[in-house]
Amino acid sequence: GESMTDQETPERAHVTADDIEAANDLIDFIEACPSMFHTAATIMAELDEAGFTYLPENAAWDIEPGGRYYTQRNTSSVVAFKVGEDLAATWGEDGVAGDYHFQLTASHSDSPTFKVKAVPELDGAGETLRLNTEAYGGMIDYTWFDRPLALAGRVLVREGDRIESRLLATEREVAIIPSLAIHMNRGVNEGFAPNRAVDLCPLISAGDLKQGDFDALIADELDVELEQILGRDLFLVNRQDARIWGWADEFISTPKLDDLACAYTSLQAFLGAENAHDVSVFCCFDNEEVGSETKQGAMSTFLADALRRINGSLGFDDSYHRALAASMLVSCDNAHAVHPNHAEKCDARNQVVLNGGIVIKEAANQHYCTDAFSRAVFQAICDDTDVPTQAFANKSDMAGGSTLGNLSNMQASMHAVDVGLPQLAMHSSYETGGVRDVMYAIRALTAFYERNLTINGAESVEL
């Protein structure tokens, strides 16, 4: 086949010490984020450390130019923003927007996994005890077999007249989904479609635990009484260690690469960039893997509510829609790299490779929000920053996926581009990406935040 774009493939750079440092920092971030609730908590801790002010949604917001703030919803979605010191709500006679606009990135905090049901236990053969789970998102089921599994999420605990949310991440492996031996399933290698209600029930005890023990063990983990537990959102976590590997240190493999790689790189870009003339916004939404149609998802009012409140607190009530028209969103969600054994699954020309640079995704059916205008803006920023880019489009006889850019645009419409890091095995319990692409993404997104865009409709933009 041909190369991934109509441009010549550039000479590949070797992995540098900076690349490895960035990839190791990503691994540390992922290991701190075993659930969407931990992802939000980890992000908010970084924002606190960087001097951001927390603004609860149920409190009044007092926002000033030069300030740095964040809010959260459901303890699983975060919107953070920095107000430029030189922000001004002025428009010229020709209608070109002045300084007041938003430049945003959006990623998501969740990954496909299995959620523990309200009544959590199932008896198994003999004296075994299993967990009663259901699928969260579209995972590759067979990748969950024979892996060390922990539990992570949140538990709602009653303390007198108060109910509070507690984070939980077991420090030990507590479950495994065992394969059926090939001697009992001779046709397994000819094709196996696991039944999630039968084959994918995790084993948690060979006989020492009984019905009712699960919540008691959760109570012990949290050092509370069993009767204090009123609710829980707990998910299975693959406890395989993340690692950088390969003779040339080219690869990073880890659970949850989709989409914590984008959450991490966009957060680092947001924290490291400086722009005195705009409102820079970082978004990390929950529930992308199950459609985003929740109060904390990209399709909710969360982002639009925050932007309106920023606008109102700054005293720019009449300028909100004009600001949106001058704004741009970079939707950050990973992209499919061409598979080494299945090149036929990708478009012959619009295919991408690991360590080839940040991916710009486009689809005629509008499942990605990229158009010629937004592609041109992001491409120019990457060109000026010497960050390589790759063009991705689905093969024309394959449906492909979608992401959160167009969904968030339903509530707050603006120019938008879909980008991501290339990876293999998307929605596996253990995914693989390229080490160099982590730093490429940080550099590209930092440049986006630092470039003060002056957008005139869809006709022109000053970089």
Task: Label the model's feature ranges.
Residues 1-463:
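N-terminal hydrophobic/helix-forming segments and targeting peptides
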